[in-house]
Amino acid sequence: MNKPVLVSFLVSGDPNADATLKFMKALDKYSGVIELGIPFSDPVADGATIQAADVRALSNGFKIAKSFEILKEFRKESNTPVILMTYYNPVYNRGIENFVTQAKEAGANGLIIVDLPLQEATEYRKICKKHEMGTVFLSAPNTPEERLKMSDEASTEFLYLISTFGITGARESFEQMTFDFIKRARKTCKGKICVGFGISKGTHAESLIEQGADGVIVGSAFVDIIKTYGDSNEAITKLEELAKELHNGIEKGFEKRNK
């Protein structure tokens, strides 16, 4: 991740496993990282778009093991880093070590456990380190300086900056607060910083990268396309078009930053 990247998020199993694999391959061309969400029945950090995608996947009988199978298939064709996103409950129920080893065997590069606070993650971090599994933690605009440093140090892949307060979902534009947060994180953090929540356009990506982000994380905008077009060639075309627009925005933002 030397140049800024697009981190593309999909919910695995939405609308089915075969479609997810096709969508991952479609996004791969323009993505530096793919974030694969494991469907969960109570996704508290996610907005209506991703909650609905979780429901679609789970109503089709989707299981965690299927996420690992999808990733194994993807690994036959691509070395693009994949981060698995989940909540703590499914990891705990499976056994932390068991989950981490299965994710590693499937080809995951890192994990995001959205609702696991850093102060409660000691055992999880030890297990991830033991199995050479990357970790990503989240920070919000109101995260104090010391906590921001700790989250940065605990995040081996990148620190996930939440652009604004609330849940995931597309929005029109970003407030100055978001840009100030990126600048603050840039000064404080030694590792990579990627910004998520609300990014859906090339112009969004451009402005966030220009301010100093190493990547933008886009989820709801891709999931909306899948909701509209389902398992179809049209969905693949639309996903590729949006990924290209976002990628171009990232390139423009990087150029502006380096002028």
Swiss-Prot record:
EC assignment: 4.2.1.20
GO MF, one example: tryptophan synthase activity
Reaction equations catalysed: (1S,2R)-1-C-(indol-3-yl)glycerol 3-phosphate + L-serine = D-glyceraldehyde 3-phosphate + L-tryptophan + H2O
Location of the active site: E35, D46
Keywords: Amino-acid biosynthesis, Aromatic amino acid biosynthesis, Lyase, Tryptophan biosynthesis
NCBIfam families: trpA (TIGR00262)
Family of the protein in this entry: Belongs to the TrpA family.
Subunit comment: Tetramer of two alpha and two beta chains.
Protein name as annotated: Tryptophan synthase alpha chain
Species of provenance: Methanococcus vannielii (strain ATCC 35089 / DSM 1224 / JCM 13029 / OCM 148 / SB)
Source lineage: Archaea, Methanobacteriati, Methanobacteriota, Methanomada group, Methanococci
Gene this chain is encoded by: trpA
